[in-house]
Structures are given as structure tokens and as C-alpha cells.
Regions:
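Active-site metal-binding motif and surrounding structural segment of the metallo-beta-lactamase
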Residues: 539-544, 549-609, 703-720, 733-738
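Cap/insert and terminal regions of metallo-dependent hydrolase folds
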Residues: 601, 697-772
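Membrane-interface helix/helix-cap signal primarily in integral membrane proteins
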Residues: 58, 62-247, 558-559, 563, ...
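Internal transmembrane alpha-helical bundles of multi-pass membrane proteins
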Residues: 5-9, 294-488, 692, 700, ...
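N-terminal leader/targeting segments
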Residues: 1-78, 300, 484-491
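Di-metal (Zn2+ and/or Mg2+/Mn2+) metal-binding site signature of metallo-dependent hydrolases
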Residues: 245-270, 572-594, 716-727
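Aromatic-rich juxtamembrane segments at the membrane interface
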Residues: 6, 172-304, 309, 524, ...
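Core dinuclear metal-dependent hydrolase active-site scaffold
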Residues: 332-340, 445-575, 622-709, 770-787
Length: 787
């Protein structure tokens, strides 16, 4: 079954990333039919017939997976074309999960039917995927049937590398869209007493935890035990993530095993039959799954537990990998899109590591260290793909964290139950969990202070992931043979050699992820809404950033800039240039400084350094021990190596030259004191002028003339009509230009007049509001990661 699960997954992947791969299934089927003809003539032995049969079944499984994905995808496309943002709809469905988050109630509905329009104009009713309804009040319960009237909210796709892709995330959950409800009506569903009881039990236990311990501890325990992340502290969540222990916050096989096995063994001690004990235990953990939100990892764990208990009840046995295979096929059949969900990949990947790698790589005499390594090493590419950084000390942290988890779980569970009857018993029972969680927090805090605790790797390329697992497979084969020899009585020398080989394996695999080839020069204009954010990496590897702010996108540094830098494997910025101190140019930079990310120098115009807003930014930078550089007209920073160097002599050298303002320049408008930069790197050159107006442009044209000629022009002031004058554009004569602004803004950017002047100059114009992030690399321009 495990083999067929691999084939089914491959079929789903081929459907997801290109129907063109369908020829593989067809080819497998043709080969199988030919082989079957040979078999029918008696040319093959019994083993040959089995091989042909396996190929035949695998071909059918592969084709079935492709067909299932295609049918689900096409069905979704058939009705999603009618769903647009802010469209009025009525939606009916059954609530399978409730959640309170960001000051609103969320109701997740399945078995949904949607009717576009309500009031006087109705469309036809359409069956659709799951829907999440946002409501200001708690007026519905788990298991209820709901009718919601409101407006559709489509989930936005990521427009920058590394940015959280809401559309992809919710699609992987089987959720099509959200509805901001104006009104809702509910009716009790079938077995409402059961669902209402589970919801009330969860809410009661969650409230009990808040009574018996502090909010931070209660938030972690509620997430671990009840799947309720309403009170989970964001700082704790981030700390666990960068330390490599965020997995403890999810309902997993450990929780299911503790609850289910404890109840099963209790019933068996009471001399309940195997069958009855199995049925009761299965009912308990299924109810637990429903109560905690029925997440993908929970369903996987529950399914594997039920298969194990069923085998025991029938007097048979099952193995981990085949149980996993059955659940993978079930989950992918139910929702093929789940393959794009990180939680699914982590859940399945961890079991694969335990079932395949751990038995081979763990020490013959049972070393816990190598057991921990064998679980986490295969997961490193998955972690890097999702978080773009790796916690190097996670192996050691988990050696302490995981053994204490049962204590935390049992203590928290008993405390939440006891707290319903009295605060004092709950406080006593929660103390072990409280102490363990504080130990976790302290341990993670100490580890994060160590150099290299979290290394930014960037999103690994496909070939590096393939190489990683290919090399690992080769090592595992070698380890398997070596371990078998040791278990057969090989001497101590063989055991030492085996340990050395494991160290070499770990080092080689880490090198595949960490060591990256030299990359080409790269320019990125990020989609920051109404603002600016520009990244450039020189051929030498030196990385700079220009501005980084937005007036309409909140938490820009956390949600856009930092994920972009991590995605691209940028471990530090050598020079961060600030054109001026308007919030739409520095809001994200301020957050990046607060995050502790490495910035070596912040460069500002000397003439504007005394402005109040700029002084506040520079004060924050000094507190973060970032070097402050003041730049004036004629100054340049040469980039001759990976470190860069300051100079005022060679204007032709690769680097950044300041064109404006000089020490004596003044202006009534802050925009006209922007740092104007000319970047030169080999054959590429560009002009970045912040928000300067046509008056400053005129000064620069008069002073520099043809020296302003460049390949690329970052349109001044987001494409304002008062910038990008005809003389300025003629002097620059750029091949292409980028305009950074929001699709909807109160300034009228970009102005038709300015764009007309650029088009008259035969300049190709790209807009972040249309193209998302714009990338220039190896003489090619990419919009939304497409050339």
C-alpha cells in the first residue's frame, strides 16, 4: 500500500504541475499491456507476472490520481469564474470548525451551496468547496447548518517572493473564498447535541486553562491540547518556529496516542473485549479530532491509530508505512490540493523519516542523538522550502523538548479538567506543564543567542532538493548494509567507522542546502502597495536595499521585506539607502531594524539627516549598532568586492553614486531633498530618485546631461504627473522603467501624463500594481516570477 501511495502522490503532483506529465501514465499503461501479452504466452515466470501486475496496478493508480486532480480542479474553475471580490451572495453549509481570531468569529463550512446575488437579483445555486464566514458575534455553533448573506472576499495571491500566499493556503485546505456576513441564520443540524457538546467542552477547557495559569501558558496549552490558537502569543509562536520546535503546537500522533492508547488500555484492564475496546477508543479519538478542528495532521494521526487498533482487534498487525500509505491516498482523494499544504507535507514527512531513516541511521546501541538527527535531517529541505531558514540547534533542543511533551500534555489536560471544578486543584496540576513550557521558552531564548542559531538558506532550488534526497538515499543504502554487519557481530572498529560515516552524511547533506553557487546580478522592485522597496545584488554578491515602506500595507517589514530577503537567501544587507523619511519609504525598514536582521550600513542624505523623522530612524539604527553613512552629491560607494568601499574618485567604477542633494541644497518640500542615486554594475545601470519633482529633475539634467543615461529608471514619485518630465526622460533614455504604487490610491498615481512621456520615449513600462514583484536577472525581466 505504501508503494501505491507513492505512485498516487506522483500522479497528483503530475496533475498539479502540468497535465503534460499525463503521457507518463499512458506510457506505463502501454508497457504494461505489452508485458501482459508476453505473460499470456507464458514467457514470464511467477515473479515476472507479479512485477507486471504491480506495474498494471501502479499505472491505474497513477492515472486515477491525475484524473481526480483534474476533475476537482476543473470543477472548481467552472464556478470560481463567477465569484468576484465584493460580490453579494447567499451561502449555505454545515459548520465543521469555529474560531475566534483578530476580533471576529470565523465559521468554516463544508457541503456548501452558493447563490450569487441576493435581494432582487438572484443567480442559480452552485455547489462549491468549503467557505469561511466572518461574523462580529458568536451566533452559530459547531454542527449547525448556516445560511449567510454577505459579500465575497477572495483570498489574495502572493505578489512577492517569500510572501505568504493566502490563496494557495486556503485552496490547499479546500476553502474557496470567504464571506463577510451581513446576516446569518442557523438551524440545528443532525446530532446537534453531539457537536454542541464538543464545542462547549472545548470552550470550557480553554476557559479553565485561562483561570489556572497565565495567558501565555494557557495559549500554548490550548493550541497543543485543543487546537485553539485564539490566545497563542505571536512571539512565542515565532520563537518556537525559529528554534525548530513549532511542531509541538499542532495536534499530532503523540496526542492521539496518549488519549487513545490510555483509554484503550484502561478498557482492556477492565477486561473489555478487543473489539469493544477498539470501537470505544476509536469513537473517543474521532470526537477529539472533531473537537480540535479536524486538521490534516490530526486526521492522518487518527486514521493511522484506528488502523493499528483495528489490526489488533482482528488479531493482525500492521506497519507504520502501509498505514501511512492508506491515509495519504485517503487525504489526497478527499482533497488533491492538500499536497500544497505545508502541514500535510510536514506530517507525512515526519512519519516517513521515522519509518525509513530512523531504523537505518539510529545508533545500533540506541543513541538518542542520532535518532533525533534521523528524524530532522530528512525534513530540512521541507523546512527550508517553507521558512527559508534552518534552526541549526534544533536537534539538541528537541532532545530536551520531546521527552517532556507527555508530561506537558497530561498535566495540561488534567489541569484543564480540574479547573472546571476549582481553581486551586487546576493550579496544582498545571504546574508541571507551566514549568516545562517556561523551560522551553528559556532554552529557546538561550539557543537563539548563539551565533548561527538560525541560518538563512533561501528557498532551495528543485535540483538541490533532488540532489539532497538522492545523496541521502545512497547513504541510507550504505548505512543499511553497514548496520546489518555490525548487528551480526562486527567489532568496535566497525561501529566507530559507522559513526564517522553518519557524521560525513550529515555534513554533506547540510552542505547541499547551505553552500550555494555564485548568483548573477539581480534587481527586484517589490510590490509594496503605495510605497517603494528596491533590492539589488551586485555581481560581486554585495546586497543593497533602497527605501522600504508603504502607506497602505501594514507590517510591511514582517510580511513582505523579510520574507523576500529570506526567500532569496540574503543573510545581510551591506548598504540600506533611505531616499527620505516619509512613512511610505521607511515603515518596513523600521520593522526590519526591530527584527534584528543584519544591516551593516544605513545611508542617508547629509542635507536631510537633521529632519525629525530621519533622526528617529537613525536613533533606532544606532541602538541596533548599525553604522550610519551620510552621503552628498559626488560621493560614491564602490562595489569592488563583497564588502564594498567608500570612494569619491572613480565615478566609472561599479557601485552607487549620489547625484543629489549637495550639502548646500535646500527645498521647502521634503520630497525635493530625496537622495538621488545612480547605480552601475557592469553593463547595467539605473537611476533611483525617490519622490523628487520635475524641478529637481531639471537641475540634474542641466548639471549632468548625457551622463544620466541608464538602462533602467525607477519612476520618480510613484509616477506622479509632477515628475518624470520630458527633458529628464530624454536625458535618461531608459530601456525600461518600473512604477511602484497601489492599484487604488488617493494620489492618482500613476498619472497618465507621466506615463505618456515615458511611452513617447519608447520606454517599456512595468507596474507593481499589475505585475507584482518585478525582477531583472541575467538580462531578463520577470513579472510575478514569469518572464
Amino acid at each position: 500500500m505504501f508503494l501505491f501511495a507513492l505512485v498516487y502522490t506522483a500522479g497528483t503532483v503530475s496533475g498539479m504541475y502540468g497535465r503534460g506529465f499525463g503521457f507518463l501514465g499512458f506510457a506505463m499503461l502501454v508497457v504494461t499491456l505489452i508485458a501482459e501479452c508476453v505473460v499470456s504466452k507464458g514467457s514470464l515466470s511467477g515473479i515476472g507476472r507479479i512485477v507486471v501486475l504491480l506495474i498494471l496496478i501502479s499505472s491505474a493508480v497513477f492515472a486515477t490520481a491525475q484524473f481526480r486532480y483534474a476533475s476537482v480542479d476543473e470543477n472548481r474553475d467552472s464556478y470560481m469564474q463567477y465569484m468576484t471580490d465584493e460580490k453579494s451572495v447567499i451561502v449555505w453549509g454545515k459548520i465543521y470548525k469555529t474560531e475566534y481570531k483578530y476580533f471576529s468569529y470565523r465559521y468554516y463550512m463544508t457541503d456548501c451551496v452558493v447563490q450569487p446575488g441576493y435581494g432582487k437579483a438572484f443567480g442559480r445555486k452552485i455547489s462549491c468547496g468549503d467557505v469561511v464566514v466572518y461574523c462580529d458575534s458568536k451566533s452559530a455553533h459547531l454542527g449547525d447548518y448556516m445560511k449567510a448573506c454577505g459579500k465575497i472576499g477572495l483570498f489574495k495571491s502572493a505578489t512577492n517572493e517569500g510572501e505568504f500566499d493566502r490563496a494557495r493556503f486556503y485552496r490547499s485546505q479546500g476553502i474557496d473564498f470567504s464571506v463577510n456576513a451581513d446576516s446569518i441564520k442557523t438551524s440545528a443540524g443532525k446530532h446537534a447535541w453531539y457537536y454542541h457538546g464538543l464545542e462547549k467542552l472545548r470552550d470550557t477547557l480553554s476557559a479553565s486553562l485561562l483561570e489556572v495559569t497565565d495567558e501565555t501558558t494557557a495559549g500554548v496549552l490550548s493550541s497543543m491540547l485543543l487546537g485553539d490558537k485564539s490566545y497563542l502569543d505571536d512571539e512565542i509562536k515565532d520563537l518556537y518556529q525559529v528554534s525548530g520546535i513549532s511542531h509541538i503546537l499542532a495536534i499530532s500522533g503523540l496526542h492521539i496516542s496518549i488519549v487513545g492508547m490510555a483509554f484503550y488500555k484502561l478498557l482492556r484492564k477492565r477486561r473489555v473485549s478487543y473489539t469493544a475496546a477498539f470501537v470505544c477508543s476509536a469513537a473517543l479519538i474521532l470526537s477529539y479530532a472533531v473537537m480540535t478542528g479536524n486538521a490534516v495532521s490530526t486526521r492522518r494521526a487518527v486514521g493511522m491509530f484506528i488502523l493499528t487498533m483495528l489490526a489488533a482487534a482482528l488479531g493482525r498487525c500492521t506497519d507504520m508505512l502501509n498505514s501511512l500509505g492508506i491515509m495519504v491516498i485517503y487525504l489526497l482523494w478527499d482533497n488533491p490540493m492538500v499536497l500544497g499544504y505545508a502541514g500535510f507535507v510536514f506530517s507525512v514527512g515526519a512519519i516517513l523519516a521515522i519509518g525509513i531513516v530512523t531504523p537505518v541511521m539510529s545508533a545500533p546501541k540506541g543513541g538518542k542523538f542520532w535518532t533525533s538527527v534521523s528524524i530532522q535531517l530528512p525534513m530540512l529541505p521541507v523546512v527550508a522550502m517553507n521558512y527559508y531558514e534552518l534552526p541549526l540547534f534544533a536537534v539538541f533542543v528537541n532532545l530536551i523538548v520531546i521527552p517532556a511533551l507527555p508530561v506537558v500534555f497530561i498535566s495540561g489536560l488534567l489541569a484543564s479538567a480540574a479547573g472546571c471544578f476549582g481553581v486551586m486543584p487546576g493550579k496544582l496540576l498545571v504546574f508541571p506543564a507551566f514549568a516545562a513550557l517556561k523551560l522551553y521558552e528559556m532554552l529557546c531564548g538561550l539557543v537563539m543567542k548563539l551565533p548561527g542559531a538560525s541560518v538563512i538558506t533561501g528557498a532551495p532550488d528543485g535540483y538541490r532538493i533532488f540532489l539532497f534526497y538522492a545523496v541521502m538515499s545512497g547513504f541510507l543504502v550504505a548505512f543499511s548494509l553497514k548496520k546489518r554487519a555490525i548487528e551480526c557481530g562486527l567489532k568496535e572498529k566497525g561501529q566507530i567507522l559507522y559513526s564517522v560515516q553518519r557524521v560525513v552524511c550529515t555534513a554533506v547533506l547540510l552542505a547541499i542546502l547551505f553552500v550555494k553557487p555564485k548568483t548573477a546580478a539581480q534587481l527586484d522592485i517589490l510590490d509594496v502597495g503605495q510605497g517603494d522597496g528596491i533590492f539589488y545584488r551586485f555581481e560581486s554578491g554585495t546586497c543593497i536595499f533602497i527605501d522600504g515602506g508603504s502607506s497602505d500595507r501594514k507590517q510591511l517589514g514582517e510580511n513582505v521585506i523579510m520574507p523576500f530577503l529570506k526567500y532569496n537567501g540574503i543573510q545581510s544587507i551591506s548598504y540600506w539607502f533611505v531616499s527620505h523619511a516619509d512613512s511610505d519609504h521607511i515603515s518596513g525598514l523600521s520593522e526590519v531594524i526591530d527584527s534584528g536582521y543584519t544591516i551593516e550600513h544605513i545611508v542617508v542624505a547629509e542635507a536631510a539627516a537633521k529632519e525629525e523623522a530621519m533622526e528617529e530612524l537613525l536613533f533606532k539604527a544606532k541602538e541596533a549598532e548599525i553604522d550610519i553613512c551620510l552621503m552628498s552629491k559626488g560621493d560614491s560607494i564602490e562595489i569592488n568586492d563583497a564588502s564594498g568601499s567608500h570612494s569619491t574618485a572613480n565615478e566609472e567604477a561599479d557601485g552607487i553614486m549620489c547625484l543629489y542633494p549637495g550639502p548646500s541644497d535646500t527645498a521647502l518640500d521634503r520630497n525635493d531633498m530625496c537622495l538621488v542615486l545612480k547605480l552601475t554594475d557592469g553593463r547595467f545601470s539605473g537611476i533611483f530618485g525617490g519622490d523628487i519633482s520635475s524641478e529637481v529633475e531639471k537641475k540634474l539634467v542641466n548639471e549632468y546631461g548625457d551622463e544620466l543615461s541608464v538602462d533602467f529608471y525607477k519612476a520618480n514619485h510613484h509616477g506622479s504627473r509632477y515628475s518624470s518630465s520630458a527633458d529628464w526622460i530624454e536625458a535618461l533614455s531608459p530601456r525600461w522603467a518600473a512604477v511602484s504604487c497601489a492599484a487604488e490610491n488617493r494620489y492618482g498615481h500613476p498619472a497618465d501624463e507621466a506615463m505618456d512621456r515615458l511611452m513617447d520615449a519608447k520606454c517599456r513600462i512595468l507596474y507593481t500594481m499589475q505585475s507584482g514583484q518585478i525582477k531583472y536577472k541575467e538580462s531578463a525581466i520577470y513579472e510575478n516570477n514569469r518572464q
